[in-house]
Amino acid sequence: TANPVIRNIIGQPKSTFNIRQIMDEGKILVVNLSKGLIGEDNAGILGSFLVTKIQLAAMSRSDIPDIKDRRPFYLYVDEFQNFATDSFATILSEARKYGLNLTVANQYISQMEETVRDAVFGNVGTVISFRVSADDSPILAKQFEPQFEPNDLLQMHNRNFIINMVINGEKAPAF
């Protein structure tokens, strides 16, 4: 690659950090995948690569027999659509049992492939929505029924949101 940042990252014979160790020891890993810094294609490739490495590290925690002994690890993904692959759909469906907790942010539902979208809505415990487009409101309104309708999502004021949560395994009313 012509980008020196990318070349320095992927051109190393050995990684300087261990994602499994970061998970197990409760450390923090922050990765800046700014498109302005490394370019859109490079950000997507590195992000997908990193997500796969995190998935593999999380799944390797199966060597800790008791789920309660798996230290929780939190993965936050902004601009989720850039990394939303079928592999990510697998992470969404299996993450909890490996102690991997996910928070993803996305601007438009249509930016996700259908399989990923189904995995997101089938596996999330909390959905937060600000004002959305006419295309997204019918899809998201299903998450907030019966308290809210599609039109409610279209007409929200700035800095207001609707939230739906699962509390102690039970779906709480949206508010």
Regions found by a protein language model. Name each.
Residues 1-100, 116, 153-157, 161-172:
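P-loop NTPase motor domains
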